[in-house]
Amino acid sequence: MPRVKGGTVTRARRKKVLKLAKGYRGSKHRLFKVAKDQVMKGRQYAFRDRKATKRNFRKLWIARINAAARMNGLSYSKLMHGLKLANIDVNRKMLADLAVNDAAAFAALAEQAKTALAA
């Protein structure tokens, strides 16, 4: 019985990798060996950066909340502590959105935080 080399399977696998490497520069989208390494590295970057995106957005929200809080006479930490004391459960994403799009509502929350801190 002759040896089976699996040509169609190999071709399909290589075609799949080269399709994933579309748009890469130079030989990284042409040659299978180089493309395979680059696709693997690209997927590592994608995995890492999915985690980093969450951190980056949290940092952005905190920076926006801090800027708006200081315009209302509070620091970020005082605002968050005051909101916790006032039993106002608003997450940072929503607070940052209020700070950017609805300054009056954010100012009202800041006032409630101030009264809770004073009490």
Swiss-Prot record:
Coiled coil: none annotated. It holds the Pfam family Ribosomal_L20. InterPro entries: Ribosomal_bL20 (IPR005813), RIBOSOMAL_L20_CS (IPR049946), Ribosomal_protein_bL20_C (IPR035566). PROSITE patterns: RIBOSOMAL_L20. GO terms for molecular function: rRNA binding; structural constituent of ribosome. GO terms for cellular component: ribonucleoprotein complex; ribosome. The keyword Ribonucleoprotein applies. One of its GO terms (biological process) is ribosomal large subunit assembly. Keywords: Ribonucleoprotein, Ribosomal protein, RNA-binding, rRNA-binding. HAMAP family: Ribosomal_bL20. Belongs to the bacterial ribosomal protein bL20 family. Binds directly to 23S ribosomal RNA and is necessary for the in vitro assembly process of the 50S ribosomal subunit. It is not involved in the protein synthesizing functions of that subunit. This is Large ribosomal subunit protein bL20. It comes from Levilactobacillus brevis (strain ATCC 367 / BCRC 12310 / CIP 105137 / JCM 1170 / LMG 11437 / NCIMB 947 / NCTC 947).
